[in-house]
Every structure is written in C-alpha cells, then in structure tokens.
Amino acid sequence: MLFLLTGDVQIGKTRWLERLAAELSGDGVQVAGVLAPGVWRVREPHEVPGERGLAGEGRFEKLGIDNVLLPGGERVPFARRRDLALAEGSFDPTSQSASAQLAWEIADEAIARVNAHFDRIAAELAAVPAGAPALPGEAGSRGYA
C-alpha cells in the first residue's frame, strides 16, 4: 500500500511520520522504508530568505536531506544543497544528480545505499509465506506496514 503525504514547507510532515512510525513499531507493527528529514539551521536575524541562496522560508534554512532507514533507524546523509556542495568542494560533476541538473547534490553512493535498503526489504518480503499476518490479528498480509 502506498500513501502520499503532502503539505506546505516546515509544517511537520516528517515529524508526524516519525511519530506514526514509532507508534506503530511500539504496537508491534513492522515499519520498513525510508524517512527523509531535512537538515536545517536557524537563520540569523539579519538574514533574508533568498539572500545568498538561503533555501526555505521562515526562520530556517534547509541545508540538506538525510535518509533514516527503517526499521533500524540508521541515518544516512543523502542530499546537500548544490550551492553548498559547490562551496564545500563536495559537488561531483559526474554524479546522477549533476547530470539531471538537480538543485541538490546527491552522491551516487547515497543512492546506492538507499536502493540496497529497499532491495533488502523486498527480499525479506519475498521470503514471507503468503498469508502471513503483517498487522496483529490481520490474516492475509505480508509482514510490513
């Protein structure tokens, strides 16, 4: 099953998903996948959004995006704003994100790490016998929420 959660910037979508995943896990539901929280910093009072490439609105500047691999909780740096990656020297002009001309620098190794995580989940699901419950008391499901 696939759900899409949408909303404005900085309204708490990721925090809500993190709480939901923790609650489901606490109830014995296996939660697997990837959460993608932003990496933010508080703007200085004199900084204006849009000035010097300051991304995001309001009090916070978005610097990057991490991935949290569930169910284990491993946090993987995933994307860095391209202007920051260029300034820091971490931009790779041969990366997939550079080829796609994204506003984010995403290391090919980070993409491979997340893809390997999804491959592992798919393999674990394939090994679950048909009809095995995913949710407590639910028959006919496949082991994950």
Tell me the role of every PLM-derived stretch.
Residues W16:
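Hydrophobic positions on the alpha1 helix immediately C-terminal to the Walker A/P-loop
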Residues A22-Q96:
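N-terminal phosphate/diphosphate-binding loop that engages ATP/GTP or pyrophosphate donors
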Residues R19:
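Active-site signature of alpha/beta-hydrolase-fold catalytic machinery across serine-
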Residues L2:
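Walker A (P-loop) ATP-phosphate-binding motif of ABC ATPase nucleotide-binding domains
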Residues E88-A145:
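Phosphate-binding/switch loop-helix module in NTP-utilizing enzymes
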